[in-house]
């Protein structure tokens, strides 16, 4: 669900989709690309820093690319802008080094292009590893690195093995002709498994925000306790242009997560559970109604209409226009498929709202009558007290439903204060109490 209570300035977008701690099983046999020849080598006795110091945006791009290829990433940070330095030098280096630790050496580069937009030079390049392509955009302005976006796309199936025996099988899920990055996390003693369903908007398979990867952390934490999981990128992440316009919940969720669920059923030995986060808590009950699953975990979400939640978020930021937001929300709730004309409300087309208006979360949960664990937190800044109360008021008397409310966990689960955007670019541990609650629910 959309952000609450403040306008967070997105300073940069580092989207590294798989972090380190493991490595691919198979060694690469491809020849290593050794870097750009355009970065000058200093002559004997010449000061290295002075010799290699780039003077233009193009030279800085070549310098950064060369250091990425040679894995000498510590030399890049000195050219970062002040805004980029909201990320600590240690976190910055770890983030870039994680790519090699996970995917191995860069074996080639392709598709180099550049453009200038509003005074910022954008350099597009594809870094090729053995099994994945890393589509990067490097943003440079006035000789400083002002942003970097990294979009990992799998080419082949491959495994990432961790020291504790957990394995992540990475593959492309074919969903009605759309190829989506997918990761199945498991261990040798695996039984039950969980399909992870993210919140609204664009999301990679880790549900990455800043440097935080909640779905990856949940998957690895569950695997350590014998519970497998499958997570996939949303179609809106890979195919953004095609998803624009007449997108509905069918395209954003139901088709792809139905196919993901089929894959999980065919590749798991035990019971299957659905874990929905944020808006995913409203999607999971519908999927459960349409498929055979053993239970639901609804994590930091609400049963309230999404337009009402957005209205409250906007009104808290801009109280002078609260009546206007209330009018929009009331209208949004009346939109049907027949009345849709391609108009946008709260950054979503009316086709989307028409499909959303068919949801009835509380009623669906009662109807399917499955074991359900609902997890919320009083520190979640993207929902409100009435959202937590709504679960309790409507479902606390149901015998097969458990409701847990933690005190210190943010919307994505971490114990962080999201009023400081810099915290999103720091390393955080996912709370053990949440992982234990999920595993205890499944094992019981």
Map each language-model feature to its residues.
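Accessory cap/linker subdomain of secreted extracellular hydrolases
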Residues: 297-365
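Catalytic active-site module of serine/aspartate enzymes centered on a nucleophile-bearing elbow/loop
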Residues: 409-413, 417-444
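Conserved alpha/beta-hydrolase
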Residues: 215-239
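N-terminal cap/lid segment of alpha/beta-hydrolase-fold proteins
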Residues: 153-189
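Short beta-strand/loop motif that positions the catalytic acidic residue
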Residues: 368, 374-376
